[in-house]
A protein has these predicted regions:
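Surface-exposed amphipathic alpha-helical tracts and adjacent flexible/coil segments at the periphery
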Residues: 1-23, 28-31, 35, 60-70, ...
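Active-site beta->alpha loop and helix N-cap motifs at the rims of alpha/beta catalytic domains
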Residues: 2, 14-17, 35-126
Length: 411
């Protein structure tokens, strides 16, 4: 039996994140326009920007999937035909859709554009997938609450021509496949229209009815608990299991995350998938450096979601609230020549610091800052100015644009 070659599907919140995803090996990217997407926080793409983004992606052999996955009311539907026609004209490779009314409009106003069913739809069984296939969908993004065995059951009952996509990395909602109303109730921001204020991440206390003004923290440990704040998902060490279940597209969450996040996570999963395909086996594990990469971004503690059964206690609920930030971008490479590296500073670093240079598809390069100089050629003991250029000795050949990072644990 042929082994599935899974697609690495990366987020692209703006043009810079699009370039990062493509450079670091994404097979496809997903992005939003200025309307009808579930992420209002990223810059997203205007109609003209979308056309340019699609052209750039296609020049590099990368597909573009456009989000159209809000749950619109009747008034919003009136604006949809123009949006769909513009998306079709831009040449997007698929529309990601939640609502059946939007699907109907897509078949009418963008009939040549493939339809992918969003995880928001909550597809958890093959009958739903077959019905959506009959309505014209070519791919489903599975409900996030499924185990690997349930994914395999879903895949086996789906039409063979239909593809199965699954989130494998990133933030998770404590709601059914992302359908949540907390934001609507508490901040009047519509979570199913791209405006979620993430109240599940807030710190909550209890108040007893007769003791007004006396607040009691909801505690699990001495540091308390954020009762609805889930860990982040990470499945980089379980690629054989995902492929065996029939998943043909590995989706990375994070359109609102940074360019650095996009680059690192895309690079890690691209490298891990390629390593597996080069020597497939049931006991495959990615190289240590590939796993380490996903710990060098801002992240919450990791878990495997529902893939291996319903989460229990510390497997899912997160007790600290904030992000883990043990690495930061120190600089971006500008040019490398004659044993000297020129960089553009992003965070302060010092003479003698050990820095890592992120490499595409291979282990990072560790260097020590020696002979640090400012743009005037003067020797300095640190690089304090954001965006300013500095040079230091470096024998390695470093491509322009490479991320150079520093462990904050060593400060």
């Amino acid at each position: 039996m042929d082994i599935i070659r899974p697609e690495v599907l990366a987020p692209a919140g703006d043009a810079e994140r699009l370039k990062a995803a493509i450079y670091y090996g994404a097979d496809a990217v997903y992005m939003g326009g200025t309307r009808f997407g579930m992420r209002a926080a990223p810059k997203n793409f205007s109609d003209d920007e979308l056309a340019r983004a699609v052209s750039f992606a296609h020049e590099n052999g990368v597909k573009v999937y456009l989000t159209c996955n809000i749950i619109p009311n009747t008034a919003q539907l009136k604006e949809l035909p123009e949006f769909l026609e513009s998306a079709s004209a831009a040449g997007v490779d698929a529309l990601i859709i939640t609502d059946l009314g939007v699907l109907s409009y897509a078949k009418k106003y963008a009939p040549k554009v493939p339809i992918h069913i969003s995880t928001q739809t909550g597809v958890a069984n093959a009958e739903s997938a077959r019905m959506l296939f009959d309505l014209g969908a070519e791919r489903v993004v599975s409900a996030r609450e499924l185990t690997l065995d349930e994914l395999a059951d879903l895949r086996s009952g789906m039409p063979k021509e239909m593809e199965l996509e699954c989130f494998v990395h990133g933030a998770m909602c404590v709601s059914y496949s992302g359908r949540c109303l907390l934001s609507n109730y508490l901040t009047d921001r519509h979570s199913n229209k791209g405006e979620c204020s993430q109240p599940c991440r807030w710190e909550y206390s209890l108040m007893e009815r007769t003791r007004h003004g006396e607040y009691f923290p909801v505690e699990e440990t001495a540091s308390g608990t954020y009762i609805m704040n889930s860990k982040d998902m990470c499945m980089i060490e379980h690629i054989p299991e995902l492929i065996k279940a029939g998943v043909s597209s590995f989706k990375i969450e994070g359109r609102a995350k940074t360019e650095y996040y996009t680059a690192v996570v895309t690079n890690a999963y691209r490298s891990a998938v390629d390593a597996y395909l080069a020597a497939p086996s049931n006991d495959f594990k990615p190289a240590r450096w590939m796993v380490d990469e996903v710990y060098k971004i801002s992240h919450r503690d990791y878990c495997t979601g529902f893939f291996f059964g319903s989460p229990r206690d510390d497997a899912q609920i997160y007790y600290k609230g904030g992000y883990v930030r043990s690495w930061e971008v120190a600089a971006i490479a500008v040019k490398s020549e004659n044993g000297t590296l020129t960089v553009s500073q992003r965070n302060r670093f010092f003479e003698g610091d050990k820095l890592e240079i992120m490499n595409r598809g291979k282990e990072p390069t560790v260097i020590t800052v020696r002979n640090l100089r400012n743009s005037l050629g003067e020797s300095v003991d640190n690089a304090p100015n954001p965006m300013a250029e500095f040079t230091f000795d470096c024998d390695a050949d470093i491509p322009a644009g490479a991320f150079i990072r520093r462990s904050t644990d060593e400060k």
